[in-house]
């Protein structure tokens, strides 16, 4: 069971002209940086979607969920397995699987929360930005789900 890190480079975070949060974001699974170590993308949009999808996955509403990056056709696919940890599949354009591994879903969820918190705290004066509001709401929902899942164990 592998631990997946979600990396957001705070030094690269900026607001685009359309008031979207952009910067370097990628995941680290084993020694692989995916899509790449310097992947520049719309961080807040990505994390907002990931928070929602992972929450649904943890609640058992989805057996399979895809977590997308905004630029390019790169995805992280979470697949529920019977009596095992979920499988994460990293796919590049044309659905080419470059890696898959069983992951610690609790750790991954907490990594998404930590990355989201970085963005929220990096732009305290911009809480009116839609993406940041969405992240804040989704963070609260995922935290509640993680508490509920941990109580059930």
What name fits each language-model region?
Residues 65-85:
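Short, structured protein-protein interaction patches enriched in aromatics and acidic/basic residues
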Residues 96-153:
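Mixed-charge, glycine-accented linear interaction segment located at domain edges/termini
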Residues 1-58, 62-64, 69:
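N-terminal low-complexity, intrinsically disordered segments
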Residues 30-37, 82, 90-103, 146:
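DNA polymerase sliding clamps and clamp-related checkpoint/processivity subunits
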Residues 44-52, 87-88, 110-113:
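Short, surface-exposed linear segments at secondary-structure transitions and domain or protein termini
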Residues 39-46, 81-84, 105-107:
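A short, sequence-level motif marking secondary-structure junctions
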Residues 22, 72-75, 100:
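Short, surface-exposed coil-to-beta transition loops
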């Amino acid at each position: 069971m592998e631990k997946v890190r979600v990396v957001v480079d705070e030094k690269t975070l900026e607001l685009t002209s359309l008031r979207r949060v952009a910067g370097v974001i990628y995941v680290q699974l084993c020694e692989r940086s995916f899509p790449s170590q310097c992947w520049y993308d719309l961080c807040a949009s990505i994390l907002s979607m990931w928070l929602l999808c992972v929450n649904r996955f943890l609640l058992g509403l989805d057996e399979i969920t895809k977590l997308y990056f905004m630029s390019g056709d790169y995805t992280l696919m979470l697949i529920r397995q019977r009596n095992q940890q979920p499988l994460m599949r990293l796919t590049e354009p044309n659905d080419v699987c470059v890696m898959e591994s069983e992951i610690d879903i609790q750790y991954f969820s907490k990594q998404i929360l930590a990355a989201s918190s970085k963005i929220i705290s990096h732009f305290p004066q911009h809480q009116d930005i839609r993406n940041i509001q969405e992240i804040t709401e989704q963070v609260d929902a995922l935290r509640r789900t993680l508490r509920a899942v941990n109580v059930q164990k």
